[in-house]
């Protein structure tokens, strides 16, 4: 039954590239076959509960601009919000959604009440999932908004806060498992520091390492089959976060024996904040064997902060999905729209239009990426560039068959005098432009 929030808007359908209907897909056709698989199954779209249904439209200079009938801290309002959310998922035809605990339940007076509220709303979600077929891509705990976490959760100097956060994560993993979630995400928004003057860096890293190990231990104890994901971000809200980027997260995982247990959820906007491109973070995660999922959005390139806008750069999406496809595609992960409306976009249909545009952009990027994979447009030149490493002597250098002395002897015997070869960057950039 309709909540009435979206009026008489019907389910969004694919109408093709020539359509001018703002409430239709021009490029996202869920049943279109791409590289032998349905487009929907490649992209695995998810809606972010927090930005879509919780964010009030405020900024540092002004408060709420969105007026939503569920903006009350009561269970009835939480259930209304859920009803609208699942109606939204059905209108868009997305297969997944994601949430933090604080997005979906009213704030209780204590841990027990928070848990009770979460369990009650999970009951409601389970009914909605059964009725609609929409699934949970991942769940997570909000360990950054409440003032108790102002000094961090896992890295807090107060062990009581560590314990409260750990217990909260347990309840959220339980909720995620009950709802059939395919991943569980950890994002350390307050796991970092504002100043080293009051920070014991080694202690905080050790605390964080133990915290993540506790999560992994509990995952195995209860038989949770999903992936544990860490979402890197360099700063904001803290000045420096310990999950700065993919490379930093991998070093952390190696130090605490977690590199085979935890993967990464990479957000485009966070990559930009860290001084990287989105494709850099994806390529590195693939190279290190820790790629899990993506949060899709974009930042304003002039602002210098995390603006969480819907994606609209097709060439960037094409390169991103080229790395996803080259790594074998999503296993348990997907494309979560961690994006929010601009604060002046106050109409209900704006929520749909923002997601429609993002989904179309990703679909165009995926199709371009798939064609590049089929044609070996990028992998072919790459293989040729590194072909010299296929000769026996080169292989021996890498596999330990040559010492430095033996390498020197080979250089002398073969009278090696290597000459530089073009990297052909401009050619490859032009190749990409042919596909997008």
From Swiss-Prot:
Q: Which Gene3D superfamilies match?
A: Divalent-metal-dependent TIM barrel enzymes
Q: Which UniProt keywords apply?
A: Carbohydrate metabolism, Cytoplasm, Isomerase, Magnesium, Metal-binding, Xylose metabolism
Q: Which GO terms describe its biological process?
A: D-xylose metabolic process
Q: Where does Mg(2+) bind?
A: 306, 308
Q: What class of enzyme is it?
A: isomerase
What does this protein need as cofactor?
Mg(2+)
What catalytic activity is recorded? alpha-D-xylose = alpha-D-xylulofuranose
As for subcellular location, the record says: Cytoplasm
Q: Name one GO cellular component term.
A: cytoplasm
Q: State which Enzyme Commission number(s) the record gives.
A: 5.3.1.5
Q: Which domain of life is it from?
A: Bacteria
Record family assignment? Belongs to the xylose isomerase family.
What quaternary arrangement does the UniProt entry report? Homotetramer.
NCBIfam families reported in the protein's UniProt record: PRK05474.1 (NF003998), xylose_isom_A (TIGR02630)
Q: What protein does this entry describe? A: Xylose isomerase
Write the lineage as a comma-separated list. Answer: Bacteria, Pseudomonadati, Pseudomonadota, Alphaproteobacteria, Hyphomicrobiales
């Amino acid at each position: 039954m309709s909540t009435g929030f979206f009026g008489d808007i019907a389910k969004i359908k694919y109408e093709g590239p020539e359509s001018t209907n703002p409430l239709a897909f021009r490029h996202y056709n869920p049943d279109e076959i791409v590289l032998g698989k349905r487009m929907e199954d490649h992209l695995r779209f998810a809606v972010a509960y927090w930005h879509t249904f919780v964010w009030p439209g405020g900024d540092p200079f002004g408060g709420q601009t969105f007026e939503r009938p569920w903006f009350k801290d009561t269970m009835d309002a939480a259930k209304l919000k859920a009803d609208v959310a699942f109606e939204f998922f059905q209108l868009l035809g997305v297969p997944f959604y994601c949430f933090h605990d604080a997005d979906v339940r009213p704030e209780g007076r204590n841990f027990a009440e928070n848990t009770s509220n979460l369990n009650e709303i999970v009951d409601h979600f389970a009914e909605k999932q059964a009725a609609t077929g929409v699934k949970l891509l991942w769940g997570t705990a909000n360990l950054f908004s409440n003032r108790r976490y102002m000094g961090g959760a896992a890295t807090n100097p107060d062990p009581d806060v560590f314990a409260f956060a750990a217990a909260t994560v347990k309840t959220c993993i339980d909720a995620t498992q009950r709802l059939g979630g395919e991943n569980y995400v950890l994002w350390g928004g307050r796991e970092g520091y504002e100043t080293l003057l009051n920070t014991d860096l080694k202690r905080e890293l050790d605390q964080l390492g133990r915290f993540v190990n506790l999560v992994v231990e509990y995952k195995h104890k209860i038989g949770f089959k999903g992936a544990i994901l860490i979402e890197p971000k360099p700063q904001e809200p803290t000045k420096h976060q310990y999950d700065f980027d993919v490379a930093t997260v991998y070093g952390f995982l190696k130090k605490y024996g977690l590199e085979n247990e935890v993967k990464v959820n990479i957000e485009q906007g966070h990559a930009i904040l860290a001084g990287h491109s989105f494709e850099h973070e994806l390529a590195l995660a693939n190279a290190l064997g820790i790629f899990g999922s993506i949060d899709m959005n974009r930042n304003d390139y002039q602002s210098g902060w995390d603006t969480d806008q819907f994606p609209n750069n097709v060439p960037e999406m094409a390169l991103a999905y080229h790395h996803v496809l080259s790594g074998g595609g999503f296993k348990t992960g997907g494309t979560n729209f961690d994006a929010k409306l601009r604060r002046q976009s106050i109409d209900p249909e704006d929520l749909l239009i923002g997601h429609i545009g993002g989904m179309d952009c990703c679909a165009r990027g995926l199709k371009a990426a798939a064609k590049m994979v089929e044609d070996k447009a990028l992998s072919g030149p790459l293989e040729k560039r590194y072909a010299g490493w296929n000769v026996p002597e080169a292989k021996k250098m890498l596999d330990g068959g040559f010492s430095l002395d033996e390498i020197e002897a080979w250089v002398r015997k073969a009278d090696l005098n290597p000459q530089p070869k073009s990297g052909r960057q401009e050619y490859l950039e032009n190749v990409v432009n042919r596909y997008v």
